[in-house]
Amino acid sequence: ISMIGGMNVQMLARSQLGWDLTGSSLAVTLVGVGFAPPMLLFSLFGGVVSDRFDNKNIIQLGQLGVIAITTFIAISIFTNTITIYHLIIVSFFQGTFWAFMMPARQSIIAELVDENQLNNAVSLNAAGMSLTTMVSPAIGGLVYHYFGPGMTYVLITFFCIIAIISTSM
């Protein structure tokens, strides 16, 4: 849940930061769309990888990648070196990580519960993702408004660290 929360906050923050940096709706569009092509291109491959390798390891590698991205963006913001190009490139890489994490995340549910509990587990996972998708951008928007983009990326990184710790258990 914390990883999905971090992703949702990041999507909001990345778009708002793109606007703040450029004042261009085209730039915001490029930042937002950058996530989609790798998701489309690599998700099928991510499913194959998920079938052949340990899903927990795939998820953790993706989480480490996202932590690296959010840390890089936070440092770039605090050092005033952030550019719109960073956001576009990072959006692409985040989409790539998620193209591998999502199939592994879906597959791992079946590994964690008995077959007779699978429908409930999938439903609970979907409900958790929906709730997180609703609440996280509100939290992220408030943090961005009151504390700025740098602290928002610190929050995102914190969410991702919680996720990798949770996945390690």
Predicted features, each with a name:
Residues 1-169:
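Alpha-helical transmembrane-bundle signature of multi-pass membrane transport and export proteins
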